[in-house]
């Protein structure tokens, strides 16, 4: 260290305290990075890597790269998006006033979960940091969106605490997680976070101390919030304390904006695991990971970023309380029924910016003049929103009308202080409105050339000296001067200092002119400082009203979400469902909300659904591939979920008994990294469903048992069906799609089981899917016909038909257990061939693969 330059010594000392971060080290107008940070940043940001003197010897060089400080947001955003932490090291004193080395310190550490800059955020979804506590008895998790100030916390206990914890993580999809020692030791939890949720994981053992946590929660949220946390489960406070500790470590600033805390019980929201969210494509599609094609894509007609985040939150957290659901659906209904008010309200909402995140940036001190003007414009637009809400005096819309604070005082202060189109930076002046501050006006006059001041001096000097040809000018040699023609040079006062003789006169300077010149030279610096001082004072005034703005923003967000649901309901001809605790799901002419929009001009065939507490509790659905079984089952699940967020639903009429969870087992794939086959993945998921489901759950099970031999698969499928149907063991409402037609015999044998199939029509050799769900079981799967539709070569289809005819003629029927003593090896071979045909995916096969399959099947047949 002794051989290092003072600046490099300072850098290394600061870097030592921030080893896990890329250090942005402020040097003049640049943020510089050195050593390994420089190499990493150069690679990730496409920067030129150079070197700098490290020590007193010229041979000692260190890698270096840099970026302009005023354009750093974009670079930081790129690093954060890749999961890095960035420590911002600023000069904490004026370099012009520094004695020796300029003092520097870390002002904040930017991480994926603590970022607040708009360049780093998706304005239509929340950005959550979470604290996770897990031990042998309890689990707790807290989520905080720093950009809006909202915090949510919950806790669990018992044997299934880890499963509930994972479901909450899947619900919020945090950008970053701080884990306690117990949580960090849970490998499955880390895999979920890092691999499946793309979440940055931070180990934070020391941050999870109960006494420190309780103290931090009290200081941050107050006594009422502390009282709301469960006393019998400290995991909630521990998770919240770990989160707050990390926030204070990284932000190094006032966090008073984070004041909105919600503790929620496990039973308040419908629970969905990651598999259900993925299979139902709530917010993104499975294949493209895109919004288009998801349920959110259909429902999102919001006009504000706040409304978009609120709608997403509702989709992620469907309600279970009937009264709360009804309040929402009644509000949607009121907007549906008042066309003019709805359309005018939507128009008014479209003029409102992201007030939640604007006030966040103002409080954190990162807002500029443009942010304040945007806030002012949004506040002024509230009057139009309130005008439309005046039509609704009762229900949730009436309450929202009262929750909209006009905020006129804040808008007026911004309007009188800040110009309508301020510059980007608040450090370079030019944004304080004329007439607000006399000194700023005077400095602006000086900066514009001091024309007013020069004119007043010129007039004054003419009157004082009687020299009517006197005029003030400027040149680069000696600055401002007074020019007097030869005919008046005898009247020049003694206070004038001659600087230049001309053919027709003389040029002079005065002390007053020199003072003015000095003012002009320093006016820019003084104006920048004064304007920033005035801006800071205004910012502090706005911060004092932050809670008012937060509450109004929340009301706007909810209103925008309700309006969006109303717009979609009218456009797509949805109905208002009756939501109750009956346990019945009854849907008349239900439609898949996404598929019908994707089809556009094509007609979507609606279907009825009835599932009761006793009758029709389990529906066995048979029919060929591509007929629409999976679409129908997803449709029922999505309509149920939509009803429980308070939305209208795509149906002629609907009655939805509240469900506590929706589980899905649809499709499968090998988990190669985990060393699990398709069948193993399927069985693991089914096991979790049967372990976690309750009698109030809705189960969507597709092709259970297809990944193994026919007998094994059919046995497993039947056992699962029996378990689901048995009210003593589970008794959950279940939609069960299968190609095992033998299972249709369970209707009449198991209470609550009902058979359905997808209607089809044969036209000669062709198959027509009618997409209609009708009572009864299908007699066959039409796999070869589907293979033909998928484009399998004619010779392969013909050969498959012949093989199937031979198998059927060969008596491959497996009699019931009571009719047989032992299954023949011939029957087993034939059954395996049939099973392989059922599992074949012709739409993904090449002709060569199809031929190879046929050869393999032929080998399995008995001689």
Where are these regions (language model features)?
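Extended, charged coiled-coil "arm/hinge" scaffolds of SMC/Rad50-like chromosome-maintenance ATPases
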Residues: 502, 506-540
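Charged, surface-exposed helical/loop "interaction arms" that form contiguous linear patches used
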Residues: 364, 368, 378-381, 399, ...
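Cytosolic, long alpha-helical scaffolding segments
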Residues: 410, 417-418, 424, 480-496
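Charged catalytic and DNA/RNA-contacting regions of genome-maintenance
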Residues: 1-337, 343, 350-363, 367-459, ...
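ATPase nucleotide-binding head domains, primarily ABC-like/P-loop NTPase cores
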Residues: 35-38, 233, 303-304, 314, ...
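Short, amphipathic C-terminal "tail helix"
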Residues: 368-371, 842-863
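Active-site phosphate-binding and catalytic loops of NTP-dependent enzymes
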Residues: 89, 112-121, 254, 392-396, ...
């Amino acid at each position: 260290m002794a051989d290092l330059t003072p600046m490099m010594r300072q850098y290394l000392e600061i870097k030592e305290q921030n080893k896990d971060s890329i250090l942005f080290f402020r040097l003049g107008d640049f943020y510089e990075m050195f050593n390994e940070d420089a190499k990493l940043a150069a690679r990730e940001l496409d920067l030129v890597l150079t070197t700098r003197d490290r020590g007193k010897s010229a041979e000692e060089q260190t890698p270096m790269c840099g970026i302009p400080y005023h354009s750093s947001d974009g670079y930081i955003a790129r690093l954060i998006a890749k999961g890095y932490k960035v420590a911002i090291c600023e000069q904490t004193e004026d370099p012009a006033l520094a004695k020796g080395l300029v003092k520097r310190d870390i002002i904040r550490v930017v991480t994926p979960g603590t970022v607040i800059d708009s360049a780093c955020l998706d304005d239509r979804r929340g950005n959550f940091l979470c604290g996770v506590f897990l031990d042998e008895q309890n689990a707790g998790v807290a989520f905080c969106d720093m950009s809006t100030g909202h915090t949510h916390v919950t806790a669990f206990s018992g044997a299934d605490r880890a499963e509930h914890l994972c479901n909450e993580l899947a619900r919020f999809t945090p950008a970053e997680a701080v884990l306690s020692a117990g949580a960090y030791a849970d490998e499955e939890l880390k895999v979920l976070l890092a691999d499946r949720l793309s979440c940055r994981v931070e180990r934070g053992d020391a941050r999870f101390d109960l006494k420190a946590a309780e103290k931090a929660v009290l200081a941050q949220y107050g006594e009422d919030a502390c009282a709301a946390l469960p006393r019998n489960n400290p995991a909630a406070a521990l998770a919240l304390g770990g989160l707050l500790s990390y926030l204070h470590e990284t932000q190094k600033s006032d966090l008073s904006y984070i004041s909105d805390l919600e503790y929620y019980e496990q039973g308040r929201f419908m629970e969905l695991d990651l598999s259900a969210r993925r299979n139902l494509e709530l917010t993104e599609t499975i294949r493209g990971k895109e919004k288009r094609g998801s349920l959110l894509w259909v429902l999102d007609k919001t006009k504000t970023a706040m409304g978009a985040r609120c709608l997403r939150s509702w989709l992620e957290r469907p309600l279970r309380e009937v009264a709360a659901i009804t309040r929402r659906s009644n509000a949607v209904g009121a907007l549906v029924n008042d066309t003019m008010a709805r359309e005018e309200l939507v128009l008014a909402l479209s003029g409102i910016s992201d007030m939640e995140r604007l006030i966040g940036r103002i409080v954190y001190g990162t807002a500029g003049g443009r942010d304040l003007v945007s806030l002012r414009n949004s506040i002024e637009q509230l009057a139009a929103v309130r005008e439309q809400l005046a039509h609704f005096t009762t229900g949730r819309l009436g309450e929202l009308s009262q929750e909209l604070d006009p905020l006129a005082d804040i808008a007026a202060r911004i309007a009188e202080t800040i110009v309508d189109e301020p510059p980007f930076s608040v450090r370079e002046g030019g944004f304080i409105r004329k007439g607000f501050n006399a000194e700023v006006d005077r400095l602006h006059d000086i900066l514009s050339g001091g024309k007013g001041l020069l004119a007043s001096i010129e007039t004054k000097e003419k009157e004082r000296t009687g020299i009517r040809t006197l005029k003030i000018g400027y040149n680069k040699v000696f600055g401002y001067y007074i020019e007097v023609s030869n005919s008046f040079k005898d009247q020049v006062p003694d206070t004038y200092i001659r600087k230049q003789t001309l053919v027709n006169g003389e040029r002079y300077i005065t002390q007053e002119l020199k003072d003015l010149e000095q003012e002009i030279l320093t006016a820019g610096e003084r104006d920048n400082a004064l304007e920033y001082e005035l801006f800071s004072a205004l910012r502090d005034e706005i911060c004092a009203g932050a809670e008012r703005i937060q509450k109004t923003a929340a009301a706007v967000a909810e209103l925008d979400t309700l309006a969006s649901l109303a717009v979609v309901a009218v456009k797509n001809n949805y109905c208002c469902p009756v939501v109750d605790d009956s346990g019945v799901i009854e849907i008349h002419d239900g439609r898949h909300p996404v598929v019908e929009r994707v089809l556009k001009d094509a007609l979507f065939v609606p279907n009825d659904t009835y599932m009761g507490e006793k009758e029709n509790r389990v529906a066995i659905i048979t029919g060929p591939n591509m007929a629409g079984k999976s679409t129908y089952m997803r449709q029922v699940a999505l309509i149920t979920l939509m009803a429980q967020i308070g939305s209208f639903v795509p149906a002629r009429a609907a009655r939805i008994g509240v469900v506590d969870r929706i589980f899905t087992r649809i499709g499968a794939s090998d988990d190669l990294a985990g060393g699990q086959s398709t069948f193993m993945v399927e069985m693991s998921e089914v096991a979790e469903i049967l372990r976690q489901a309750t009698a109030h759950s809705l189960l969507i099970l597709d092709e259970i048992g297809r990944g193994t031999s026919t007998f094994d698969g059919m046995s497993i499928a039947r056992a699962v069906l029996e378990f689901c149907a048995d009210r003593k063991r589970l008794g959950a409402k279940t939609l069960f799609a299968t190609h095992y037609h033998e299972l249709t015999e369970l209707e009449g044998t198991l209470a609550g089981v009902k058979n359905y199939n997808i209607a089809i029509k044969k036209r000669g050799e062709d198959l027509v899917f009618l997409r209609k769900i009708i009572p009864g079981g299908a007699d066959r799967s039409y796999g070869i016909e589907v293979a033909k539709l998928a484009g399998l070569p004619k010779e392969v289809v013909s050969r498959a038909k012949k093989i199937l005819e031979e198998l059927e003629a060969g008596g491959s029927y497996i009699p019931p257990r009571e009719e047989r003593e032992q299954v023949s090896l011939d029957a087993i071979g034939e059954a395996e061939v049939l099973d392989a045909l059922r599992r074949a995916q012709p739409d993904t096969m090449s002709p060569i693969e199809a031929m190879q399959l046929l050869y393999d099947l032929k080998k399995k047949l008995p001689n």
